[in-house]
């Protein structure tokens, strides 16, 4: 047997084992990701079939302070639908895939214009009036920062 053939025989089982281990490490997430998202409102929005939340298909491109970002969501008309708002920290965290980084979204997600940035949530910090919660789509972690900073916001449809 050639050296190349022996190398391939060693690499293939290792690759298969790694793939299987990856799937088994996150079985609930891998199984639940199938059919998770549906395009709605003529493709302008995405329904998360796990949570029932409807998200903009393409998050806001504007970087703005917390208050104006929330106001912009409230005034939006996406796919002919009004009633948008800034998401809570808990709602925005539902989009995170803990196995992914940069961006921390599930593979095959239908969103566009996703940046591995920190996005505002509508959740203020209860201990500090000048601070609000955000979610990093690079790491998938929630963080806080001053409301005077500029970030993008990913609007969600009011239930």
Which residues fall in each region the model found?
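Glycine-aromatic-enriched surface loops/turns that form tight recognition elements
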Residues: 2-85, 89-159
């Amino acid at each position: 047997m050639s050296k190349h053939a022996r190398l391939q025989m060693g690499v293939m089982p290792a690759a298969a084992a790694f793939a299987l281990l990856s799937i088994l490490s996150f079985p609930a997430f891998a199984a639940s990701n199938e059919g998770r998202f549906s395009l709605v409102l003529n493709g302008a929005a995405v329904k998360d079939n796990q949570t029932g939340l409807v998200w903009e298909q393409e998050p806001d491109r504007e970087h703005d302070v917390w208050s104006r970002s929330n106001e912009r969501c409230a005034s939006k008309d996406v796919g002919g639908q009004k009633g948008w708002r800034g998401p809570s920290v808990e709602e925005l965290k539902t989009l995170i895939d803990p196995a992914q980084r940069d961006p921390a979204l599930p593979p095959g997600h239908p969103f566009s214009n996703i940046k591995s940035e920190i996005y505002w949530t509508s959740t203020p910090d209860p201990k500090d009036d000048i601070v609000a919660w955000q979610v990093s789509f690079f790491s998938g972690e929630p963080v806080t920062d001053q409301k005077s900073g500029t970030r993008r916001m990913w609007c969600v449809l009011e239930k």
